[in-house]
Amino acid sequence: MQELQPIIEEAFERRADITPRNATPQVKDAVMAVIDLLDMGQLRVAERTDGQNWTTNQWVKKAVLLSFRLEDNAFIKGGYTNYYDKVPSKFADFNSKDFREGGFRVVPPAAARKGSYIGKNVVLMPSYVNIGAYVDEGTMVDTWATVGSCAQIGKNVHLSGGVGIGGVLEPVQANPTIIGDNCFIGARSEVVEGVIVEDNCVISMGVYIGQSTKIYDRETGEIHYGRVPAGSVVVSGNLPSKDGSYSLYCAVIVKKVDAKTLSKVGINELLRGI
């Protein structure tokens, strides 16, 4: 794996000149090796180092970007329809044995691109998982939810209907959006721009969080940016301006719960009485 990084780094510096016809076999093989490792979950765009801290493997993201320079659009059969794209489906060559061994469910017309990883006991309702994404075991990706490029989704997460988890291939220095273990993301919520939602959080319906979103803790008065602390229950809200003439959207941490409480208490109960 270490021998792949310098090949990717060097090729990325001249990516504007690379085409499917002039790319060297060495570059093609290195990029496809990275995509295959991502697809199997043996390599990740971001990795947890300790606690709630994550490290981004920027060179892996560069390999994903390079993959778009190496492929022409191609005809992709879809059974009841057809597609035309540079990246094949993760399941293009799957048979029933492959699905059984994968240990996950895929409900039509869910789509996952080659280079995404789907863990054991994951359920993909009609949803979309982009290249470089990692969906860990026991997670539900509900109807019309989107897992963006290189996003990292933890264990036993529920992404409710219409949820959007942002992708961050461009700009390449940006970190991926990360959802920690045992989180619940409510319907039609959006978490984007490399925001980290730490473990055991509950995000209510219709909450939008980007890097510039104020995340206000009503118990302490503290304002966070880009990170939702572990165990937070979050709803949408507003904060007034200093002169009181207007208010702007924010996300509000209304309470904190531990993993034990989260496992015993229903989501609706946590969101009642806030």
Swiss-Prot record:
Positions with a binding annotation for substrate: 105, 142
Annotated Pfam families: Hexapep_2 (PF14602), THDPS_N_2 (PF14805)
GO BP, one annotated term: lysine biosynthetic process via diaminopimelate
Subunit structure, interactors included: Homotrimer.
Protein name in UniProt: 2,3,4,5-tetrahydropyridine-2,6-dicarboxylate N-succinyltransferase
Species: Thiobacillus denitrificans (strain ATCC 25259 / T1)
Protein family according to the UniProt entry: Belongs to the transferase hexapeptide repeat family.
Keyword terms of this UniProt record: Acyltransferase, Amino-acid biosynthesis, Cytoplasm, Diaminopimelate biosynthesis, Lysine biosynthesis, Repeat, Transferase
E.C. number(s) listed in UniProt: 2.3.1.117
Domain of life: Bacteria
Pathway: Amino-acid biosynthesis; L-lysine biosynthesis via DAP pathway; LL-2,6-diaminopimelate from (S)-tetrahydrodipicolinate (succinylase route): step 1/3
Gene Ontology molecular functions: 2,3,4,5-tetrahydropyridine-2,6-dicarboxylate N-succinyltransferase activity; nucleotidyltransferase activity
Localisation: Cytoplasm
Reactions accelerated catalytically: (S)-2,3,4,5-tetrahydrodipicolinate + succinyl-CoA + H2O = (S)-2-succinylamino-6-oxoheptanedioate + CoA
Keyword Secreted set for record: no
Broad class of the protein's primary localization: cytoplasm
InterPro entries, A to Z: DapD_Trfase_Hexpep_rpt_fam, Hexapep, Hexapep_transf_CS, THP_succinylTrfase_dom1, THP_succinylTrfase_N_sf, Trimer_LpxA-like_sf
GO cellular component, as recorded: cytoplasm
